[in-house]
C-alpha cells in the first residue's frame, strides 16, 4: 500500500465515556475480534489488556490512555482507551486533541451521566466527529430508547439511530441493522465470534420501519439528488445511505447510535464496521492549525505524507522496560529512526532513537512512521506534553493544548533523608507525564505541595510514588486550591534601577492590568486562558528582545498572589510603554521590573479570593430528598435542578469544594447508603467576605 493511499485507511479513534459504562471492556472485545488479543481480558478480574498499570488492575478503572493499533477489514485502527473518572478528564482532553473520531460509550441502564456530559463537551471543543454505542443492553433496567432521548435532552445532540436492540435485559440477543433492514443475531457459545443475519422478527417490523423512515429523513437532507429520489418513492440504496451517514458524521450533522453488550460479546463487529465506514480518516480532517516559526504567522497545514515532518507530543509515560516514552501523533511528513528533529516550543533538538507501535503494554519496534500514525518514541530529552516536533528546515508549532488548573492540594514529606532525593525525582517524572498534576514548594513552610484534579488523582500519584519509585512519604490532609483575581482595571508605571558598582540594571515598564471578563476585544484563542499577556509597544520604547522577559516575570510572579499568596488568574496584562538603557538593560532587568510592577500594581485592582465550585450530582430515592437538599444548602450549595430518573431523584447543585470534604460519609448516613454522588469541577467563583477572612487568617 503506498504511503499516500495509506492515509485513507487509517482511523485514529478514542473510546470515551463515564466510569463503568464499559469502555475498557468494549476495547478488549475490539482487540479480541481484530485478532490482537488471544484471550479476552475482563476488567473485574483485573486482567484487561488496556488497563496495564497495577493501580488500574486493582481498582478496575482506566487511568492512563493506552494507545493500541489493530486492523479491521483492510483498515488500520489506532485506539486510545481513555479514563472515565472525573479526576482524569485531562487524559481524555489530551487524547481528543490528537484523534480524528471517537466512540462515546453509554451505559444502557444509567444513560447519559455527568462525566458523559464532560467528555461530550470536550469532544465538541476539538470538533471531534463521533458515534454512540449504547452498551450493557443485557443488564436489568437497560432502556435503549430512553438513552436516545437523553442524548437529545442532556447533550443537545442529534442522534441518528442506525440499530435497534432485539430482546431486552437477559433476553437481549442481537440488533436490527436499519441500513440493511436485517436482524443480526449472535451465538452465545462462540464468544460472540459467530453471528448470522435473519429477517426482522414480526413483532419488531413496525418499529424498524418507523426508525428506518426517521433515518432516511435525516440523511437525505445532505444530498439533493438522493432527496429527489427518496421523495419520488424510489429505493435509496444501502451504499447511498452509508455514504450520507459518513458525510453527516464527519460534519457533525448528527451522531450515529448503535447498541450492544460488549461484556456478552454482542454488537462489537458491527461497531467496528461503523468505525471504518463512518468515522473520518486523516484525509477527511485535511488540515491542522499551527504557526510558522520563521514568520510567526498562524496558518492551516495540510495533513499529508509529502509535506515536511510535524507531530504533536500528547502523552509521556514511564515504561518499566524502555524508560520514558513520548507518544506522538504525526500530522505530516514521515520520520525514521536516527533522524534529528527540533522541538519548536523549547527550541531544542531531539534525536529519534527507538520508535514503537504500542499494543497496550506490548510493543513492536518500527523503523519508519508517517502522517496519520500514532507512535511512542523512547529517550527524548526535552519534550513534554503539548510540544511540537518538527522538521529542522521548515519549523512549525502546532496548536497547543490548554490544561485546567488543579483544584485540590496535599502536603507531602519524605519519611527519611534517603526518600528526600528519590521523592524529588519521582515527583518531577510524574509531573512530566501529567500536566494537570503540579508540584511546588510552600515558601513559608518549605513543604512540598502536590496539586491535582481530585482526591483519587492524588491518591494514585502517591501510590505510584510508593510502587514505582519506592518512596515512602507522610501525607497531609487535602486542602482546597484557592486562587486570586482582580476586579477592576489598574495601571502601573515602574522603573527598576540598580547602579552600584559593576554592571548596572535598568528597565522601565508601564503595564495595564485588567480582569479578563472586562476585556472587550479578547481573541478566541485567549478565551480559555487564565492569564493573557500582550505588548502594545510602538516605536521601540522597549526593544523586542526584552519583551519575553516581561511576560516571563509576570508569569512567574502570578504564582504568588497579593492577598494570601495563591496564584492569580483571569487577568490580562498589557505592556503599553517603557524605557531602556543601551548598556544596563537586559532581559533579566525587565523580568525584575515586571515582577515589581505586579507586586505594586495588583493591590490597586481590588483583588479578591476565588474558590473552586464543583457541579455535584446526587442520585437518591425520593424519601431522602429533603434531608439531602437541606444538607447541600448548609454547605453553601446552590441547587440547579431536580429531575426524576426511573424510581429515583437526581439533584444537581453547585457547591464550593471546601464544603465537600467527607461528603461521601454524610451522604451514606443521610440515605442509609442508598444515595450516590459524583462531582466535576465547574468554575472558580469569589469567596464570600466572611469566609475569605478565615482563609487569610490561616495563611
From Swiss-Prot:
Catalyzes the GTP-dependent ribosomal translocation step during translation elongation. During this step, the ribosome changes from the pre-translocational (PRE) to the post-translocational (POST) state as the newly formed A-site-bound peptidyl-tRNA and P-site-bound deacylated tRNA move to the P and E sites, respectively. Catalyzes the coordinated movement of the two tRNA molecules, the mRNA and conformational changes in the ribosome. The keyword Hydrolase does not apply. PANTHER family: RIBOSOME-RELEASING FACTOR 2, MITOCHONDRIAL, TRANSLATION ELONGATION FACTOR G-RELATED. GO terms for biological process: ribosome disassembly. HAMAP family: EF_G_EF_2_B (MF_00054_B). Signal peptide: none annotated. This is Elongation factor G. InterPro entries: EF-G-like_DII, EFG_II, EFG_III, EFG_III/V, EFG_IV, EFG_V, EFG_V-like, G_TR_CS. Residues 8-283 form the tr-type G domain. The gene is fusA. One of its GO terms (cellular component) is cytoplasm. GTP binds at residues 17-24, 81-85, 135-138. Keywords: Cytoplasm, Elongation factor, GTP-binding, Nucleotide-binding, Protein biosynthesis. One of its GO terms (molecular function) is GTPase activity. The keyword Cytoplasm applies. It is found in: Cytoplasm. Belongs to the TRAFAC class translation factor GTPase superfamily. Classic translation factor GTPase family. EF-G/EF-2 subfamily. It comes from the Bacteria.
Amino acid at each position: 500500500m503506498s504511503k499516500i493511499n495509506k492515509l485513507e485507511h487509517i482511523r485514529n479513534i478514542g473510546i470515551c465515556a463515564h466510569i463503568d459504562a464499559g469502555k475498557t471492556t468494549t476495547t478488549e472485545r475490539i482487540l479480541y475480534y481484530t485478532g490482537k488479543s488471544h484471550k479476552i481480558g475482563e476488567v473485574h478480574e483485573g486482567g484487561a489488556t488496556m488497563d496495564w498499570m497495577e493501580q488500574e488492575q486493582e481498582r478496575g478503572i482506566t487511568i492512563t490512555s493506552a494507545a493500541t493499533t489493530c486492523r479491521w477489514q483492510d483498515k488500520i485502527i489506532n485506539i486510545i482507551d481513555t479514563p472515565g473518572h472525573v479526576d482524569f478528564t485531562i487524559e481524555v482532553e489530551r487524547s481528543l486533541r490528537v484523534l480524528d473520531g471517537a466512540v462515546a460509550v453509554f451505559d444502557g441502564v444509567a444513560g447519559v451521566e455527568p462525566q458523559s456530559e464532560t467528555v461530550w463537551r470536550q469532544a465538541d471543543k476539538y470538533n471531534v466527529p463521533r458515534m454512540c454505542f449504547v452498551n450493557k443492553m443485557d443488564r436489568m433496567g437497560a432502556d435503549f430508547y430512553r438513552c436516545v432521548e437523553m442524548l437529545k435532552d442532556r447533550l443537545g445532540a442529534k442522534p441518528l439511530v442506525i440499530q435497534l436492540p432485539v430482546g431486552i435485559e437477559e433476553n437481549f440477543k442481537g440488533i436490527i441493522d436499519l441500513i440493511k433492514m436485517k436482524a443480526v443475531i449472535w451465538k452465545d457459545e462462540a464468544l460472540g465470534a459467530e453471528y448470522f443475519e435473519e429477517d426482522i422478527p414480526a413483532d419488531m417490523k413496525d418499529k424498524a420501519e418507523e426508525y428506518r423512515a426517521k433515518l432516511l429523513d435525516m440523511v437525505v437532507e445532505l444530498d439533493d439528488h438522493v432527496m429527489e429520489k427518496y421523495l419520488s418513492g424510489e429505493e435509496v440504496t444501502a451504499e447511498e445511505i452509508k455514504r450520507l451517514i459518513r458525510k453527516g458524521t464527519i460534519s457533525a450533522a448528527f451522531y450515529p447510535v448503535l447498541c450492544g453488550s460488549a461484556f456478552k460479546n454482542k454488537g462489537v463487529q458491527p461497531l467496528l464496521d461503523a468505525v471504518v465506514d463512518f468515522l473520518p480518516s486523516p484525509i477527511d480532517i485535511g488540515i491542522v492549525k499551527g504557526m510558522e516559526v520563521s514568520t510567526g504567522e498562524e496558518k492551516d497545514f495540510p495533513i499529508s505524507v509529502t509535506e515536511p515532518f510535524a507531530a504533536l507530543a500528547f502523552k509521556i509515560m514511564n515504561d518499566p522496560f524502555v524508560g520514558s516514552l513520548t507518544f506522538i501523533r504525526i500530522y505530516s511528513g514521515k520520520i525514521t529512526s536516527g533522524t534529528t528533529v527540533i522541538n519548536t516550543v523549547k527550541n531544542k533538538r531531539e534525536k529519534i532513537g527507538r520508535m514503537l507501535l504500542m499494543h497496550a503494554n506490548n510493543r513492536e519496534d518500527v523503523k519508519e512512521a508517517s502522517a496519520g500514525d500514532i507512535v511512542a518514541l523512547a529517550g527524548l530529552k526535552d519534550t513534554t506534553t503539548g510540544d511540537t516536533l518538527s522538521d529542522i528546515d521548515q519549523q512549525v508549532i502546532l496548536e497547543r493544548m490548554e490544561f485546567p488548573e488543579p483544584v485540590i492540594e496535599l502536603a507531602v514529606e519524605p519519611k527519611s533523608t534517603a526518600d528526600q532525593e528519590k521523592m524529588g525525582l519521582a515527583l518531577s517524572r510524574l509531573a512530566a507525564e501529567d500536566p494537570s498534576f503540579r508540584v511546588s514548594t510552600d515558601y513559608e513552610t518549605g513543604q512540598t505541595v502536590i496539586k491535582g484534579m481530585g482526591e483519587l488523582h492524588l491518591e494514585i500519584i502517591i501510590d505510584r510514588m510508593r510502587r514505582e519509585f519506592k518512596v515512602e512519604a507522610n501525607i497531609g490532609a487535602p486542602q482546597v486550591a484557592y486562587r486570586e483575581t482582580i476586579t477592576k482595571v489598574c495601571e502601573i508605571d515602574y522603573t527598576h534601577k540598580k547602579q552600584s558598582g559593576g554592571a548596572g540594571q535598568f528597565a522601565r515598564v508601564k503595564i495595564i492590568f485588567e480582569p479578563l471578563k472586562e476585556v472587550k476585544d479578547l481573541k478566541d484563542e485567549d478565551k480559555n486562558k487564565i492569564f493573557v499577556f500582550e505588548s502594545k509597544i510602538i516605536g521601540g520604547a522597549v526593544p523586542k528582545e526584552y519583551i519575553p522577559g516581561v511576560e516571563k516575570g509576570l508569569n512567574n510572579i502570578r504564582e504568588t498572589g497579593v492577598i494570601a499568596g495563591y496564584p492569580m488568574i483571569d487577568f490580562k496584562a498589557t505592556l503599553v510603554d517603557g524605557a531602556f538603557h543601551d548598556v544596563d538593560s537586559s532581559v533579566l532587568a525587565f523580568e525584575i521590573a515586571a515582577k515589581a510592577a505586579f507586586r505594586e500594581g495588583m493591590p490597586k485592582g481590588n483583588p479578591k479570593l476565588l474558590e473552586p465550585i464543583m457541579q455535584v450530582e446526587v442520585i437518591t430515592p425520593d424519601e431522602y430528598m429533603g434531608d439531602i437538599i437541606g444538607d447541600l444548602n448548609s454547605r453553601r450549595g446552590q441547587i440547579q435542578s431536580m429531575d426524576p430518573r426511573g424510581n429515583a431523584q437526581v439533584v444537581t447543585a453547585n457547591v464550593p469544594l471546601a464544603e465537600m470534604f467527607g461528603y461521601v460519609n454524610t451522604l451514606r448516613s443521610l440515605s442509609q447508603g442508598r444515595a450516590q454522588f459524583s462531582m466535576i469541577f465547574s468554575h472558580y467563583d469569589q469567596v464570600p467576605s466572611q469566609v475569605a477572612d478565615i482563609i487569610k487568617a490561616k495563611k
